């Protein structure tokens, strides 16, 4: 599949650190138009995607923080190519696919319907120096029709993890569960995420 995309991204970030921030807000909104000849896609109308990511850090004390987040992606048009479908899984945005949304409890990539929205809440405790424990819960909903999103299929999941903020980046181990798998999931990260 040969395609080209025209996109526009708005980013605003006031987080004090990239990893384990203590305060701040992150907001990103993006729009992409996908074509194969700058006019059409596969001889028909092009399709597009709208994305939104919001996260804030609410410090409860000098060691304990609450991190609510809300994010989603909507595909517009009926001719969406498989490589651009919505995907969830893992701990970070865009880990394996540029449009991948994180979801605690799902460590692999899953393809979802044309509209997906996720609400996530993390409770992070710094236990000593650069050591952190994070409890994450998230709920998502997806449907092919954005206007009937609330009638879509539900996703839920959660994880509990330990991380050390090293000079080589975060070293972490996480255990998670979701309604999309029947076994406890394990994820390990060794260093910076590129």
State each model region's role.
Residues 8-11, 15-127:
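C-terminal outer-membrane beta-barrel translocator/porin domains of Gram-negative envelope proteins
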Residues 1-6:
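Single conserved hydrophobic/aromatic residue that forms the stacking wall/gate
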Residues 24, 61-65, 128-132, 164-170, ...:
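Strand-connecting loop/turn motifs
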Residues 122-156:
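C-terminal hydrophobic structural anchor segments
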Residues 101-103, 114-118, 128-134, 155-159, ...:
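Active-site lining segments that contact anionic ligands and/or coordinate catalytic metals
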Residues 38, 144-145, 170-172:
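Short small-residue beta-strand/loop micro-motif enriched in glycine and branched aliphatics
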Residues 28-32, 69-73, 134-138, 163, ...:
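Transmembrane beta-strands of outer-membrane beta-barrel proteins
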Residues 162-169, 173, 182-194:
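Outer-membrane beta-barrel "beta-signal"
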